[in-house]
Amino acid sequence: MAARGETPEVETREDEEQGVKLAEILELLVAAGYFRARIKGLSPFDKVVGGMTWCITTCNFDIDVDLLFQENSTIGQKIALTEKIVSVLPKMKCPHRLEPHQIQGLDFIHIFPVIQWLVKRAIETRQEMGDYIRSYSVSQFHKEHSLPEDQDFELRREKTVRTLSETLDVYRPRRKYKRQGGSSELMDEESRVHSTLLEYGRRYGLSKQMKPEKPEDRRVPVPQGLVGKGEVREEEEELRAEEELRIKALMTEMAATGMEEGRLTASTVGQIVGLQSKEIKQMVSEYAEKQSELSAEDRAEYLGAAQQHRRKVASLSKLIGQRKKLLDQLQEKASELQSGCGETRKQLTEVTSHMEKLDQELSVLENMESKADPSVLQKLRDLVAQNESLKAQEQQFRSKCREEMSRLQQNIDGLKAAATEHGEEKEQTQAFEQQYKAEREKLQKIRLLLARRNREIAILQRKIDEVPSRAELTQYQKRFIELYGQVSATHKETKQFFTLYNTLDDKKVYLEKEVNLLNSIHDNFQQAMASPSARDQFLRQMEQIVDGIRQSRNKMEKKKQENKMKRDQLNDEYLELLEKQRLYFKTVKEFKEECRKNETLLSKMKGPTP
């Protein structure tokens, strides 16, 4: 048990792998931006814990730590700090587990994955914050300022919008034809849609003003599976004829909008002229009929393109049907393969989990074997080997006994058969029974001996388990040191509470005295002011009270100065002890280095001379 006021040293693993991991951790922290890890005067614990705290705060997570750096912390303070760090890691969804004693014991092999993950998370958070701050700065800049390109755009915007609206107004859809008032009403929706498109000069997307296509452009690419089929051609011809009749019927019921709007009706002409109304009406109707016939003849030129589109749609529809069937078949095969793949993945995950479980058990057994005492372990191995050999001998003996018993049983059966024939079985039967009893007793003795040996092995194994190993003793020592630190911290805190209580109690007593004095002055003031003698006596009493208060105050000031001097003296002693402690640690380190050099020189001197 370490003496009070001294900082106990914790046993740490100082092998090559731990040193390599520490160097990698420091390189990661420096690369991430934690340059305090370069300071050579800091201990590895301060560098690692400081780097972890810096990464956690960079990731915008709160951690309850002391902002003021304190060198040579006690075991209790280190445990409290590591527990706070470990409690924050699950909140950050860290995939690696870490215990406080691993950080305190400087187990860099287990600390390295956590540091690696924290550095990666800190860099990602810093990049996200940089992007956010950059976008926020750009938005604030655009709110207050504008670029020359934006100013030019605002100047040209109004003119551009006006030009665009005029262009849209010029090229907007215009009605070129209109159904006549006396035409029959269309019943189905497709005919109404087709009629409306024809009124605006469009036939399935082809404008009236477009030039007729060339014969080679009108050729429809026929799929490979439809070449040379007469039924498709006949169907296309029928569709073409039906479409031509349909368009012709629709166009005969329409008239040009400009002609109809510019035409004067018979009633209007009669009202204006007042004579020959019938002749004018007849001429106007004849003119309208001629105009409709001419417009119908003009539209006949564009019927071929629509029928060609119909044929293309029919051929492509059949090709789409074939492709859909093929797609359904491929989807069924894909679903079957997907289900098989899912089962295979499930089996793979089961096998992988089983392998991981076996690896974990094997690593636990290897760890236990490395921590155990070599001599006790070798003795236990010898006993286990002896037990295994005895078991093997028992199995061999049992197999031999079974073979011997079967052979003897065969002999008995043969002898019984021979005895029944010759009548000489009694003596042989008795001899065999005696031999059987002897072998049975021998087997029972061997079983008792084996049970006694197994019991001795179990007793020795329990005794071995009761003896603590070196690792367990080290763990007990660490725990006792931690408990001592916690007890000392609790004692210090309790002492502070007692001091605070005594201070507050003294303050309460002085306040009560002050209140009683003020109440007494208030009660006797009127009576003392009634006569001069009473007033003089009252003033003398007040002067005596003030003198007493001054004396008490001087005593307290003197006591305060004494305590302050004592505190300064203790602080100086504490600083001297700290300096001695630093010198002690430095001397121990130099002594270890000299011992290492001495061992190196001795090993070189003992080496074989050439």
UniProtKB/Swiss-Prot annotation:
Q: Which GO terms describe its cellular component?
A: early endosome
What name appears for this protein in its UniProt entry? Answer: Coiled-coil domain-containing protein 93
Q: What does this protein do?
A: May be involved in copper-dependent atp7a trafficking between the trans-Golgi network and vesicles in the cell periphery.
Keyword annotations of the record = Coiled coil, Endosome, Protein transport, Transport
Mind listing the GO biological process terms from this record? protein transport
Q: Which InterPro entries match?
A: CCDC93, CCDC93_CC, CCDC93_N
Which source organism does the UniProt entry give?
Xenopus tropicalis (Western clawed frog)
Q: Give the location in the cell.
A: Early endosome
> Which lineage is the organism of this entry classified under, starting from the top rank?
Eukaryota, Metazoa, Chordata, Craniata, Vertebrata
Family, per entry: Belongs to the CCDC93 family.
> Which residues are in coiled coils?
229-467, 511-580
